[in-house]
Amino acid sequence: MFNLFLIDTVWYVGQIIFIVAVCLMVTIIVVAFLASIKLCIQLCGLCNTLLLSPSIYVYNRSKQLYKYYNEEVRPPPLEVDDIIIQTL
């Protein structure tokens, strides 16, 4: 009888250890999945910082320079008579 009780106790302890191990594995897998999602979000933010923001800045700055060149730096267009005189 004592031997049977010891086997039952070992069985229950083994079941508890198995349940704890399964819970730990599930917890590790869930934490790894959430960490990978967080990493993806951080990489998207990094992509925004390194690629999107500078390209928007370059686009806006080049548009400003284009307007500045057309309004202030570029000489006025020549009339047809002036072109003929310059070619002669």
From Swiss-Prot:
Subcellular location: Host Golgi apparatus membrane
Residues in the Virion surface compartment per record: 1-16
Topology relative to the membrane: Single-pass type III membrane protein
Key word Membrane present: yes
Primary location group: host cell
One GO BP annotation of this record: disruption of cellular anatomical structure in another organism
GO cellular component: host cell Golgi membrane; membrane
Keywords noted in UniProt: Apoptosis, Host Golgi apparatus, Host membrane, Membrane, Transmembrane, Transmembrane helix
Pfam families per record: CoV_E
PROSITE patterns: COV_E
Transmembrane stretches, start-end: 17-37
All ranges on the Intravirion side of the membrane: 38-79
Keyword Zinc: no
InterPro entries: E_protein_bCoV, E_protein_CoV
Assembly with partners or alone: Homopentamer. Interacts with membrane protein M in the budding compartment of the host cell, which is located between endoplasmic reticulum and the Golgi complex. Interacts with Nucleoprotein.
Family to which the UniProt record says this protein belongs: Belongs to the betacoronaviruses E protein family.
Summary of the function given for this chain in its UniProt record: Plays a central role in virus morphogenesis and assembly. Acts as a viroporin and self-assembles in host membranes forming pentameric protein-lipid pores that allow ion transport. Also plays a role in the induction of apoptosis.
Name the UniProt record assigns to this protein: Envelope small membrane protein
Species of provenance: Rat coronavirus (strain 681)
Phylogenetic lineage: Viruses, Riboviria, Orthornavirae, Pisuviricota, Pisoniviricetes
Gene: E
